[in-house]
């Protein structure tokens, strides 16, 4: 048997912000590592969403990595950001935070990890 690895997709689902101005971490699991992270707005939501790092401030832009534009009630193409680690599972989802202009809105967050496979 040959030992191989492949990427397996996983998802946090929608990471919603209960209180605008109070960034919410993607996860509190600081041990989790990922090879790839995808952040996308939820179609139909109406407020801007912000992705950043600990201590981010959407009002000043400090710590903000990306500002996502909403699709609105009419739908449309969802704004997204994909981060990839070319050297394996080096991205730590717990390092990323979401903030929103509208309570209850947020981002859909997916991630990929390398898993062993024996063929």
Please describe what each predicted stretch is.
Residues 1-24, 29, 99-119:
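C-terminal interaction-tip segments
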Residues 43-63, 67:
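Short, surface-exposed beta-strand/strand-loop-strand elements in extracellular ectodomains
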Residues 26, 39-45, 100:
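Asparagine-centered strand-capping/turn motif at beta-strand->loop junctions
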Residues 32-34, 41-47, 104:
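Short proline/glycine-enriched turn/loop motifs at strand-loop junctions of beta-rich domains
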Residues 68-93:
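Beta-sandwich interaction modules
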Residues 12, 23, 34-36, 76-80:
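Intrinsic-disorder/low-complexity, polar/charged segments enriched in Ser/Thr/Lys/Arg/Asp/Glu/Gln
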Residues 35-37, 87-107:
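Noncatalytic modules at the cell exterior or secretory-pathway interfaces
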